[in-house]
């Protein structure tokens, strides 16, 4: 977008300036004081320079020596995976964990530690008990599955036996019937009946 041109407000109007600021003679007349006025003894005010003065308190400036980095000096990098013996820092504990050497404080700390240890121990015991219960449930489930499988196998065998048994029974019954018929034919004598 094209920026809008801002119109100067009252472009044709003139600014009103006092002669004191514009005319040197008028300024000098103001600076002149007469003995008849109250401010005759006062010295004319001096204008303050608004330029900031350096805060060196009159001391000469000393240039700081430039500190060069290792890259600029071309120093090879140390192997940071292995700390040199002299450069190891002393191990520090956590901040704010230093207690006063008082018997009461030590006693309190020991009591609190015992409570925490007992809580942790009870948690461990609970975890062990839960493990035992889980194992027992697992064993029960495995037993049930084994029993179900055994029942299924028995039923399969029974079904096979019955299907085989039915056909064998039928054959045996037929054989028995045939034998009976044959025996019946051989043993039976024709009886003759005579009428008188």
From Swiss-Prot:
One GO BP? intracellular mRNA localization
Coiled-coil parts of chain: 121-167
Report the locations given in the UniProt record: Nucleus, Nucleolus
Q: Where is the composition biased (Basic residues)?
A: 187-196
Keywords per UniProt: Coiled coil, mRNA transport, Nucleus, Ribosome biogenesis, Transport
For the keyword ATP-binding, the answer is no
Instruction: Supply one GO CC term from the record.
Output: protein folding chaperone complex
In this chain, composition skew of type Basic and acidic residues spans 8-26, 140-156, 166-186
Stretches for region Disordered: 1-65, 140-196
Q: Which InterPro entries match?
A: Loc1
Which GO-annotated molecular functions does the record name?
identical protein binding; mRNA binding; ribosome binding; RNA folding chaperone; RNA strand annealing activity
UniProt lists compositionally biased (Polar residues) regions at 30-42
Q: Which family does it belong to?
A: Belongs to the LOC1 family.
What does the protein in this record do? Required for efficient assembly and nuclear export of the 60S ribosomal subunit.
Q: How does it assemble?
A: Component of the 66S pre-ribosomal particle.
Q: What is this protein called?
A: 60S ribosomal subunit assembly/export protein LOC1
């Amino acid at each position: 977008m094209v920026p809008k041109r801002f119109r100067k407000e009252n472009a044709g109007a003139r600014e009103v300036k006092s002669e004191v600021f514009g005319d040197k003679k008028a300024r000098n007349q103001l600076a002149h004081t007469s003995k008849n006025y109250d401010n005759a003894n006062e010295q004319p005010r001096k204008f303050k320079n608004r330029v900031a003065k350096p805060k060196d308190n009159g001391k000469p400036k000393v240039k700081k020596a430039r500190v060069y980095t290792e890259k600029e000096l071309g120093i090879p990098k140390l192997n940071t995976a292995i700390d040199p013996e002299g450069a190891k820092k002393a191990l520090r504990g956590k901040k704010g964990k230093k207690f006063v050497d008082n018997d009461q404080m030590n006693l309190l700390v020991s009591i609190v530690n015992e409570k925490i240890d007992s809580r942790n121990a009870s948690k461990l015991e609970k975890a062990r008990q839960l493990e035992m219960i889980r194992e027992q449930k697992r064993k029960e489930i495995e037993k049930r599955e084994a029993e179900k499988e055994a029942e299924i196998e028995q039923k399969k065998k029974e079904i096979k036996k019955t299907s085989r048994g039915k056909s064998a029974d039928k054959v045996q019954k037929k054989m028995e019937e045939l034998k009976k018929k044959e025996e019946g034919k051989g043993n039976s004598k024709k009886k003759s009946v005579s009428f008188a």
